[in-house]
Amino acid sequence: VTSEPGARLDDLVLHLAALAGTPTLFNPYADTDPTVDGSDAPAIRRGNLGRYLRAFMDRDEIDLWLGEAPSRFGARRTGVPFSGEGYLADLSSRLAIAPFGIATDEALATRPSSTSRQIWSALPARLPLFWNAVMHHPHRVGTPLRNRTPTRSEITRHREALTLLIAAIRPRRILAIGRVAEGAAAGYDVPITYVRHPAQGGAAQFRAGVAEFGRDAS
């Protein structure tokens, strides 16, 4: 059994890559989208996620911000939750790590999702760790760039990844962004705070919830 934290994080990335995708669930760590990806895109995304996770390895009092699933313009393309290509340079700078790789061949998604814009605008100075209840991109049949809510069975299949993450990182608190994330976060010995998901008119409530979450830490 692997016990060293860095090796456990590497195992986590490999675990996500080994989880098979489906016709409506794109695995960014193993699968290639021929319309936008370079041939080595899955390896780049695995490298991005591994580098991102290792940046938190020696940090104390980490807050975990848990979302629902990747968006079409976020981790589906980059491998890093809540982070499309347009945020990668800022993220690597704030984490003081080497630049992330670009896995796609075209620049469409310098355009962020509305959810990621709200999340990035609400970030505290001390960065939280981003994760999703489902780390593969759920989409509709025949429309790979149309987001959908993950199913209960998909969340269950990805629970082991969340368990591995929590064991390796040991977050002090979880900010659950939306009810799907709140349900996925249950059952761990980590305090959970629910905030309204910023989509579909929830932006103001989301910002207020994040602000209160930040005050509770002080």
Residue ranges and their predicted role:
Residues 1-4, 218:
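Polar low-complexity intrinsically disordered regions
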